[in-house]
Amino acid sequence: MSEESRNHRKVYQGRVVSDKMDKTITVMVETYKTHPEYGKRVKYSKKYYAQDDNNEAKVGDVVRVMETRPLSRTKRFRLLDVVEKAVII
């Protein structure tokens, strides 16, 4: 099935913060919310575990992950694609 036929699933873009596990990456997704009273934008971040079958994503890469069925106790996302590779200095 393609991504277009699964429109109801959430797709997030975030940065890989860990790839030490086999076939699993940790992705940090940052979002902004506006404070209801003061109107200031506040940054929120959340970490998600995602399935990476080919171990292609590395730390620092910007990736897109899509919601899927539960793959383990904590894993509910799978890697769609690597948007931007990390620059190695």
From Swiss-Prot:
Entry-linked PROSITE patterns? RIBOSOMAL_S17 (PS00056)
Q: Which GO terms describe its molecular function?
A: rRNA binding; structural constituent of ribosome
Listed transmembrane segments: none
Q: Name one GO cellular component term.
A: cytosolic small ribosomal subunit
Q: Does the keyword Plastid apply?
A: no
Any Pfam family hit: Ribosomal_S17
Record key words, sorted: Ribonucleoprotein, Ribosomal protein, RNA-binding, rRNA-binding
Q: Which GO terms describe its biological process?
A: translation
Coiled-coil stretches, from where to where?
none
Quote the InterPro entries the UniProt record gives: NA-bd_OB-fold (IPR012340), Ribosomal_uS17 (IPR000266), Ribosomal_uS17_bact/chlr (IPR019984), Ribosomal_uS17_CS (IPR019979)
Highest taxon of the lineage: Bacteria
Q: What does this protein do?
A: One of the primary rRNA binding proteins, it binds specifically to the 5'-end of 16S ribosomal RNA.
User: Which protein family is named in the record?
Assistant: Belongs to the universal ribosomal protein uS17 family.
Q: How would you summarize the oligomeric state and partners of this protein?
A: Part of the 30S ribosomal subunit.
Q: Name the HAMAP family for this protein.
A: Ribosomal_uS17_B
Protein name (Swiss-Prot/TrEMBL): Small ribosomal subunit protein uS17
